[in-house]
Amino acid sequence: MADGLGLPRFRTRASRMQLIKSPTRFYKAIESIIERAQERVFLSSLYIGKDETDLMDTLKTTLSKRPALRAIVLVDALRSTREGQFRIDPVTRRPNTSCASLLASLTRDFPDQVDVCLYRTSGLPVWLEKLIGKRVVEGAGLQHMKIYGGDNEFIMSGANLSHDYFSNRQDRYVHFWDQPLLSNYLISLILLCGHFSYRLMAAKAVEAGKEHPHHSAYALQWDGSNSQLLLGEADDGTVNEGGCHIAALERQPLREHKFAFDAGKLVNAFTQRWRQHCEEELANYNNTQVTNDEDDDNAAFVVPLLQMGPLNITNETDAMPRIFEALRREGLAADMPGCLDLTSGYFSLHSPYKSLVLDAPSEAFETRIVAAAPESNGFFGSKGISRHIPMAYTWLEQKFWKAVQRRGKERSIELLEWVKSGWTYHAKGIWWTPPRTRALGPTHTLIGSSNFGYRSALRDLECTFLVEAPQSGQSCLTHVLKEEVNDLRHNATVPVNDALFAQDDRKVSWGVRIAAELIKGRL
């Protein structure tokens, strides 16, 4: 598949991947990665919770101990500055804080060790934020990649870095270690995105001589390649101080609000460059590796799928039809169905994906979908207009189920809702199990930030890994993926059917229906 799409394909070992099973372990794993880092820390998230001072203290302590350590952080500008500028209320003396003010304390305390970059979707006029509010403008597009790493290890996830994601919000997390090439790829990706983002600069203290230990006033400075980040990608794909692969940018800096076309060209060049690095690495492996059947049986592959609609980067939407076609061929050839599992905390399938699911022949594979029940939606019980979002997803879910019924696919397409008392559901992913390994488990999975909806396809910056388990089907990774699917399905206890939508609490008002249709491209 990587060859057909012109994408890099990384060879690794299944024994160097581990699924993390709970939010609390996810937090501990991130802390440990930061504490172990000797040379670099790289973090990419939608935002970091403004109260995550313990996590920032871990990073600050590690930076203090290791002056040679460098860190790069990439977050979304709109989401991270939603609360406004850092200030201290003159009456209550309480500070007004945000993700940006939290991270600004990093650049204030470690200006020679830390870069913080805030991505803001191209083409959005600043006056629009003031007219309708940042939270509404966020629907136009966000930096959504979730990558948390240090040195040659990292966690690929769909979770952000805030309290709910560390306690009672179900997501997915895969820890990769001893991965120098993949780690270089990811940090290079973050650095590249940093060059068409804003640099976060700590501003003058709010009150002379009175700096907040965990927050700072800040300013945003457009990069556009005008400034040199602390780290850069070298010609051989390694990342170090002084490495820089933006020569084209230096000749013509990116424009602040009109960078999408040029940034897209840079991402395409990045992808081709890394495809070449992977080919060279594989050739070196084949030339030097003594034949080892045990090692070959443990070989797994990772294909990063970048989806950046505003930049016209469409790896995921290009790959999805090929994934479904591969399952179709295997299922029909085996004369017995395979299985495709799909889950999203925000179930609003991109129209082409919806068609792929509905058009798939029942004799080739069955599809099992897990979505969040309304009370498991992260917006359930919120204030303001966002309180209607769970019912908007209910309406889109009902429309999908009606389409399943019109196709007569109720027996081959199963839709369940996930419910766990006191928890919300944020997991997203796809697993597919061909007929030959039906008893053993999935041979492939998609793990990352994409929710497979309209937003993921068209508006946000997404990075999702297509992971290929060893082809023997006997790999520990295959068994672990099967266990992961079963664990997620354990709380998927609400079957979606006509009886469910007939319940009073599932009746969607006409106002929400109309609004859902109008804004579904932003959900």
Regions found by a protein language model. Name each.
Residues 1-109, 113-146, 150-523:
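Charged, low-complexity intrinsically disordered terminal segments
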